[in-house]
């Protein structure tokens, strides 16, 4: 299996190169695509990262997220990740905001939204990536982000406020 190379950008999100994921330097900027999924009740689906993940194990984040690989676009990546991580295919997402995150990891995140009515059990999760998925009401998630921020990926609070 070959290692994937990810896109490296400048601070304007223009591609300046590609690197093996393991060789990324702290100051280098890469691309991520993330998907907010809601249902007709206004609930929000979150995914808990697999406990064995190197980065942020066990933390809750958007239903789908992935680092954009060489040869991919934000759009193609989010469709691929939705199918791989939670078994959704042929989806029609709506492109939302793009945000730059800077800190321990430096990346641009292109957010997408999707409305779908399924129970948490109806999603086919990729066990190597996702521990579980769960629907949260907006009020429940707001309370969780306020009371237990350490259980959630950094930046999720900002993204939730923009949703």
Predicted regions, residues:
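Short loop segments at secondary-structure junctions
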Residues: 12, 39-42, 50, 115-120, ...
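A short, polar/proline- and glycine-enriched secondary-structure boundary/capping micro-motif
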Residues: 27-29, 55-60, 134
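A glycine-rich, hydrophobic loop/mini-helix early in the fold
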Residues: 34-64
